[in-house]
Regions:
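A short hydrophobic beta-strand segment most commonly corresponding to one strand
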Residues: 163-166, 190-192, 206-221
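Residues that flank catalytic or metal-binding motifs in active/ligand-binding sites
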Residues: 140, 159-161, 208
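A short beta-strand-loop-beta hairpin characteristic of the jelly-roll/cupin
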Residues: 166-186
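Short beta-strand His + acidic residue motifs that chelate non-heme Fe in jelly-roll/DSBH
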Residues: 153-155, 173-175, 184, 193-205
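Short, conserved beta-strand element in jelly-roll/cupin
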Residues: 146, 157-173
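Residues in well-ordered beta-strands of folded domains
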Residues: 143-145, 166, 176, 202, ...
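Non-heme Fe(II)/2-oxoglutarate
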Residues: 2-129
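A short glycine-rich, His/Asp/Glu-containing loop-to-beta-strand
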Residues: 127-149
Length: 221
């Protein structure tokens, strides 16, 4: 039986023995390492104000789930009720088993519909973030995503790319896109992540990680 990785180069035993003598780099694990699909933008917010806004918001609202929690920051215009379960997640694609065949999961979400800031956030720093982002790009669902310690997402791809603004993080919080792995520091920067490629998020640290994310509907495939 053949597998998709069979054509990859294999390390010879001689090279393997040489490799054993080389010490790995253990000092750069908390640094940002860009790739074609993960880029830091020249756009930055005040991390102290972001963390303060998050702490204040958590006194009023709860994350939707104990493991992969969501707090919506935008909504459909004049929306009166909460997001549906599908709105919290939305369409994604996986190659879920040994057949390596892609399948779609959950229903599509029209990201462009989520154009309005949730009204009770108008007096928060998240309103400033929303105003600045929409000045530079079209965004869809803007959410706070929490990832608890010792957890990971599925290996999947989305219909459109995302931006990430890390707020609470740790060196074990990693993003992997097309097998490229990097940490995203919580330094106030906006990070472009092309989540149209296969990706996952991992929190291998001791504390929860919280990112502000926003979908980019103009990148819909």
């Amino acid at each position: 039986m053949s597998y998709p990785g069979d054509k990859a180069d294999a390390l010879s035993i001689t090279d393997f023995q040489r490799r054993l003598a080389l010490a790995p780099n253990t000092e750069a694990v908390d640094q940002f390492n860009p790739s074609a699909e993960i880029q830091r933008l020249n756009l930055r917010f005040d991390i102290t104000k972001l963390r303060s806004a998050l702490a204040n918001l958590e006194q009023r609202k709860s994350f939707s789930d104990e493991v992969w929690g969501v707090i919506p920051l935008t909504q459909r215009p004049s929306q009166s009720g909460p997001w549906s379960d599908n709105d919290l997640s939305g369409r994604y694609y996986m190659r879920a088993d040994e057949r390596y065949e892609e399948a779609a999961f959950e229903d599509c979400v029209d990201e462009a519909e989520f154009s309005e800031l949730v009204p009770d956030l108008a007096d928060t720093y998240f309103a400033h973030v929303h105003e600045v982002l929409t000045r530079h790009m079209k965004i869809g669902r803007m959410r706070l995503l929490r990832k608890v310690a010792y957890s990971a997402n599925s290996w999947h791809r989305d219909p459109e790319p995302r931006i990430h603004i890390p707020i609470i993080t740790n060196p074990g919080s990693l993003l992997i896109v097309n097998h490229h792995c990097t940490h995203l520091p919580a330094d106030g920067h906006v990070y472009f992540t092309d989540t149209r490629a296969y990706h996952t998020a991992v929190n291998g640290g001791l504390r929860s990680r919280v990112h502000l994310t926003a979908a980019l509907p103009e990148g819909l495939l």
